[in-house]
């Protein structure tokens, strides 16, 4: 074993040190992101918004629209969207608070009915204060969304300066680095921009379609708050892997509380919403997205949990864009190629096997 390590084929000391330093740097960054959350979270959101609005910026720039007018149009759209979100949150919380006593009584009735079927004393349910659990949850969610809305001023300020310098960024790279390095930088940024811009654009379209279908279906079934669940389905669709599962789960749970003991409608609601998520998420969206960056689904889920732990709901929403950024960076740094292989999905393995088969033929 020691002999192998001393040969040229063994681990080189500088390579081990590089890996160690990388791990230390990553841990320092994680600590900084967690401690200085109030600073880094608006910065991260502004970067993701920058990728989202950049196609609009380039589209209007083709028609020789003045840059100040492009920025004005983009910010008008963003402010309008933010106002709609704030109005929706206020409406949703108000409606939920009004209906909360009904749902509390209905939930108590369901639990008593289930316990009585198993001949268990249900008198203990009378002492349970469900509102004591639900009100803090709604208040916490409301405060988090209001806090996010209030931080939009900082986000928009950062985005403004980002857009004002975006047209000279390539020239800065050419001046700062030599030609091969600057070209590689620009290529990596183009890849990140294309991947994230295309992902977010198509995600908005399919999420809107999902929300519309959810609203129509729940209205026909007679479920309460169809608009609330439609908008939440739209938002949850941006959370990779588990977002659609969470959307269906919350819709079905509230449907069960509302329609119990009529379980047929609950079953119809479950089948309808599951079918929408499967058809759009597994058939329509992959066809629209086409060829995407090859990322391991398992590691994508790990990144999802990591960003969710780090920054909550905002972390869940930005997990995929930042995973793409990490993947493109490790793809373009030679001594990080090993990490790129582990971050890749099944496509990279087929490429490796294809190359090895060609080598055998040669």
From Swiss-Prot:
Superkingdom field: Bacteria
Q: Which InterPro entries match?
A: AI-2E-like (IPR002549)
What UniProt keywords are attached to this protein's entry? Cell membrane, Membrane, Transmembrane, Transmembrane helix, Transport
What is one term from the GO cellular component aspect held by the record?
plasma membrane
Segments spanning the bilayer are 20-40, 43-63, 68-88, 144-164, 212-232, 234-254, 265-285, 304-326
| Pfam families (alphabetical) | AI-2E_transport
Q: Primary place of residence?
A: membrane
Report the subcellular localization.
Answer: Cell membrane
- One GO BP annotation of this record: transmembrane transport
Q: Please state which protein family the record places this protein in.
A: Belongs to the autoinducer-2 exporter (AI-2E) (TC 2.A.86) family.
Q: What is this protein called?
A: Putative transport protein BB_0006
Organism annotation? Borreliella burgdorferi (strain ATCC 35210 / DSM 4680 / CIP 102532 / B31)
């Amino acid at each position: 074993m020691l002999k192998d390590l001393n040969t040229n084929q063994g681990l080189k000391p500088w390579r081990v040190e590089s890996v160690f330093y990388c791990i230390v740097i990553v841990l320092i960054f994680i600590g900084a992101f967690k401690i200085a959350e109030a600073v880094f979270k608006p910065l991260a959101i502004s970067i993701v918004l920058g990728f989202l609005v950049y196609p609009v910026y380039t589209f209007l720039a083709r028609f020789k629209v003045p840059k100040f007018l492009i920025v004005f149009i983009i910010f008008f759209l963003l402010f309008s969207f933010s106002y709609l979100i704030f109005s929706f949150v206020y409406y949703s919380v108000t409606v939920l608070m009004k209906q909360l006593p009904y749902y509390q009584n209905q939930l108590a009735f369901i639990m008593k009915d289930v316990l009585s079927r198993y001949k268990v004393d249900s008198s203990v349910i009378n002492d349970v204060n469900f509102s004591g659990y639900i009100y803090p949850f709604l208040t916490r969610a409301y405060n988090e969304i209001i806090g996010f809305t209030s931080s939009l001023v900082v986000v928009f300020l950062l985005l403004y300066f980002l857009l004002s310098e975006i047209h000279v960024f390539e020239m800065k790279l050419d001046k700062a680095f030599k030609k091969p390095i600057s070209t590689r930088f620009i290529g990596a940024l183009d890849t990140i921009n294309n991947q994230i811009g295309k992902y977010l654009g198509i995600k908005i379209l399919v999420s809107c379609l999902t929300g519309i279908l959810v609203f129509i279906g729940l209205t026909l079934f007679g479920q309460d708050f169809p608009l609330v669940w439609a908008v939440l389905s739209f938002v949850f669709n941006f959370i990779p892997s588990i977002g659609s599962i969470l959307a269906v789960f919350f819709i079905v749970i509230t449907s069960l509380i509302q329609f119990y003991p009529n379980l047929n409608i609950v079953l119809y609601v479950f089948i309808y919403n599951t079918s929408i998520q499967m058809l759009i998420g597994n058939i329509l969206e992959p066809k629209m997205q086409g060829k995407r960056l090859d990322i391991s689904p398992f590691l994508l889920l790990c990144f999802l949990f990591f960003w969710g732990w780090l920054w909550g709901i905002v972390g869940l929403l930005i997990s995929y864009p930042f995973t793409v950024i990490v993947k493109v960076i490790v793809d373009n740094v030679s001594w990080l190629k090993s990490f790129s292989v582990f971050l890749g999905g099944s496509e990279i393995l087929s490429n490796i096997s294809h190359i090895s088969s060609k080598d055998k033929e040669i």
